[in-house]
UniProtKB/Swiss-Prot annotation:
Subunit structure: F-type ATPases have 2 components, F(1) - the catalytic core - and F(0) - the membrane proton channel. F(1) has five subunits: alpha(3), beta(3), gamma(1), delta(1), epsilon(1). F(0) has three main subunits: a(1), b(2) and c(10-14). The alpha and beta chains form an alternating ring which encloses part of the gamma chain. F(1) is attached to F(0) by a central stalk formed by the gamma and epsilon chains, while a peripheral stalk is formed by the delta and b chains.
Swiss-Prot/TrEMBL keywords: ATP synthesis, Cell inner membrane, Cell membrane, CF(0), Hydrogen ion transport, Ion transport, Membrane, Transmembrane, Transmembrane helix, Transport
GO CC entries: plasma membrane; proton-transporting ATP synthase complex
Family the UniProt entry places it in: Belongs to the ATPase B chain family.
Function field: F(1)F(0) ATP synthase produces ATP from ADP in the presence of a proton or sodium gradient. F-type ATPases consist of two structural domains, F(1) containing the extramembraneous catalytic core and F(0) containing the membrane proton channel, linked together by a central stalk and a peripheral stalk. During catalysis, ATP synthesis in the catalytic domain of F(1) is coupled via a rotary mechanism of the central stalk subunits to proton translocation. Component of the F(0) channel, it forms part of the peripheral stalk, linking F(1) to F(0).
Record CDD domains: ATP-synt_Fo_b
First-listed, main subcellular location of the protein, grouped into a coarse class: membrane
SUPFAM superfamilies linked to this entry: F1F0 ATP synthase subunit B, membrane domain (SSF81573)
UniProt name for this protein: ATP synthase subunit b
Membrane-spanning parts: 2-22
GO molecular function, one term: proton-transporting ATP synthase activity, rotational mechanism
Family annotation (InterPro entries): ATP_synth_B-like_membr_sf, ATP_synth_b/b'su_bac/chlpt
Lineage: Bacteria, Pseudomonadati, Campylobacterota, Epsilonproteobacteria, Campylobacterales
Amino acid sequence: MFVVKMVLGFLILLSPLCATGLDISQTDIIERSLNFLLFAGILWYFLAKKLRSFLRSKSLEISKRLEEIQAQLKVSKENKKKLLKELEQAKEKAELIISDANKEAYTITQKYELQTKIDVENLIKNSKALMDLEVKKIKRELVESVFKDLRESKKVSFNAQDCVNILKQRL
C-alpha cells in the first residue's frame, strides 16, 4: 500500500516534467527513480515490522514511565495533604497548650496572690497580738516595779484593797 502511494506520488511529481516537453531520453532518471522506489519498498518490507514494534515498545515504555510518574505525583500530593493536615493539627494543639498554660499561670498567680495576702494579714494580726502582749507585759512589769519601789520606800502605805483598785485601773 505504501509502495503504491510512493509510486503515485513520484509519478505526480514527474508529470510536470513530461508536460514541459523536455527531452529526457538522454538521461536515466526513470531507471534511477524505479531503482530508488524498489529499494525503498524492499527496505520498507524488511524494516516496517521491526520499526513498528520498536516504536510500539518505546511508546509503551514512555506510557509506563508516565504512569509511574503520575502515581508518584499522586502519592506526593497525598503526603503533602497529610503533612499539611498534621501541621494544622500541631498548630491547633500548640495554641491549645499555650492557652492552657496561660490559664494555669493566671490561676497559679491568683492562688499565690491570695495566699500571700492571707499570709500578710496573718503576720499583721500576729504582730499586733505580739505587740499587745508585749505592751501588757511591759505595763505589768512597770506597775510591779512601781509597786515594789513604793512598798520598799515605806513612805506610802497601801492596803490590799488599794493595790487591787490601782491594778484594775492601770491594767
